[in-house]
Amino acid sequence: MKENVFDVLIYLFENYLDRDTEQAPDPDEMRTELLEAGFPQREINRAFDWLETLGAQQPMRAASLPAFRIFSSEELAKLDVECRGFLMFLEQNGILTAASREVVIDRLMALNEEIISLENLKWVVLMVLFSQPSEEVAFARMENLVYESFPGYIH
């Protein structure tokens, strides 16, 4: 079984994080369940570190002026034209702000994947929006894009 950090994150999100419960899940129980499900300890630890860093980031504030994003060479190598276009689409349609886009890019780069797929990008956007207070509307809109078929978008 060749699982990576992203697979662990998706498992956690679908089974624990996206629930309407008041009580937070026990991290030790989650780790045990992940091990029993066959995920490697190293990837579990990396996923928890990824989530901890996401949770430690300050709540996002919308920029007062529109911003033009220039991607670094490392970002260009990991995020193909389709991914960059989708980020722009989300920002232009009010799902992401310039600030939330930066958090998404930071979390994508932290995955240590050679290339980020559009599917992985969508899930990371969903996780970032879920983690931020007062982003319920954007989260709901993004959730529809992840869970439902989505017609093509303009590049």
Swiss-Prot record:
UniProt xrefs under InterPro entries: Smg
Domain of life: Bacteria
Listed Pfam families: DUF494
Similarity remark: Belongs to the Smg family.
Protein name: Protein Smg homolog
Organism: Methylococcus capsulatus (strain ATCC 33009 / NCIMB 11132 / Bath)
Lineage start: Bacteria, Pseudomonadati, Pseudomonadota, Gammaproteobacteria, Methylococcales
